[in-house]
């Protein structure tokens, strides 16, 4: 199934809706659709690509960096996050983790 993922960041002037299949990582879908998001390891093992889920649901079971508190607060790693519903994600949220 393909979901609509809204990517937002006021500072970076990002407000875009991308289509993301439920078997594609949000970061990869964004890149394919011309939206540059930060990343480093692409393996869910660092925080460069961190975002925050504002609404909707995602699956990031492959990530190994965020702790339960951070995930509970809505943070996600876009490089290993699949959408499981239409969702809205704030990008460039690494600084907000700490």
Curated annotation (Swiss-Prot):
Q: Which residues form the 2Fe-2S ferredoxin-type domain?
A: 3-95
Q: How is the cofactor bound?
A: Binds 1 [2Fe-2S] cluster.
Q: Where does the protein end up?
A: Plastid, Chloroplast
Cofactor(s) this protein requires: [2Fe-2S] cluster
Q: Which UniProt keywords apply?
A: 2Fe-2S, Chloroplast, Electron transport, Iron, Iron-sulfur, Metal-binding, Plastid, Transport
Name the CDD domains for this protein.
fer2
- Extract the Pfam families matched here: Fer2 (PF00111)
GO terms for biological process, alphabetical: electron transport chain
Q: Extract the GO molecular function terms from the UniProt entry.
A: 2 iron, 2 sulfur cluster binding; electron transfer activity; metal ion binding
Q: What is the top-level taxon of the source organism? A: Eukaryota
- Residues engaged in binding [2Fe-2S] cluster: 41, 46, 49, 79
Q: Name one GO cellular component term.
A: chloroplast
InterPro entries referenced in this protein's UniProt entry, alphabetically: 2Fe-2S_ferredoxin-like_sf, 2Fe-2S_ferredoxin-type, 2Fe2S_fd_BS, Beta-grasp_dom_sf, Fd_pln
Q: Which family does it belong to?
A: Belongs to the 2Fe2S plant-type ferredoxin family.
Q: What does this protein do?
A: Ferredoxins are iron-sulfur proteins that transfer electrons in a wide variety of metabolic reactions.
Stated name of the protein: Ferredoxin
* Organism for this UniProt entry: Bumilleriopsis filiformis
